[in-house]
Regions:
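Short intrinsically disordered, low-complexity coil segments enriched in acidic
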Residues: 1-2, 176
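Phosphate-binding loop of NTP-binding sites
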Residues: 98-176
Length: 176
């Protein structure tokens, strides 16, 4: 399932949001059939055929203009932005909730192929996670399988490479 990426049309993102009760409205300017090949909320990561997510209290319209200049073909937001060109947009009730639906569709529901464990609490989460990882990895090694992955406030290990964590709760787009 993870081998080949399937891409979806703008209209399919609208339908996914509508199904989950997150859709508010949209103006697609006849571009509903355009295929989305990139999904991001970071204007520095925009490329051709990007669905750009306008999120956060610090979001500035200049980020959206930069994204459109780099190839964003549609944006999703809680409000409409004034732009020079007719850029399709999708309005949602809650951008953070909508991000999980967008990421799920864009990455073809990768969670369906995973077994997940979540740890919450006030103290000892990372310690508990690394104890669990050691136990699970011993089991996986005995089965001739790959190491387990981990996302913590210390680092993120996807089974291949490890990077230092910079935030305690990654966004849905990164988690997928």
């Amino acid at each position: 399932k993870m081998a080949e990426m399937k891409f979806y049309k703008i209209q399919e993102y609208v339908e996914a949001l509508r199904k989950r009760g997150m859709f508010a409205s949209c103006e697609l300017y006849g571009k509903e059939e355009n295929v989305i090949r990139n999904l991001t909320y970071n204007s520095k990561e925009v490329s051709e055929d990007t669905l750009f997510i306008c999120k956060g209290a610090a979001f500035k319209p200049v980020y959206l203009r930069e994204a459109v200049g780099k190839g964003a073909v549609c944006y999703i937001s809680e409000k409409v932005f004034e732009l020079e060109a007719e850029v399709p947009y999708i309005l949602v009730k809650d951008i953070r909730e909508a991000m999980s639906v967008l990421a799920n569709l864009f990455y073809n529901n990768p969670w369906e192929d995973l077994r997940l464990v979540g740890v919450g609490g006030t103290k000892g989460k990372s310690t508990s996670v690394y104890y669990m990882k050691a136990i699970v990895d011993d089991y996986l090694e005995a089965q001739n399988k790959k190491d387990s992955a981990v996302i913590s406030s210390i680092d993120i290990y996807d089974g291949k490479s490890k990077v230092e964590s910079h935030i305690t709760t990654p966004e849905a787009v990164e988690l997928q």
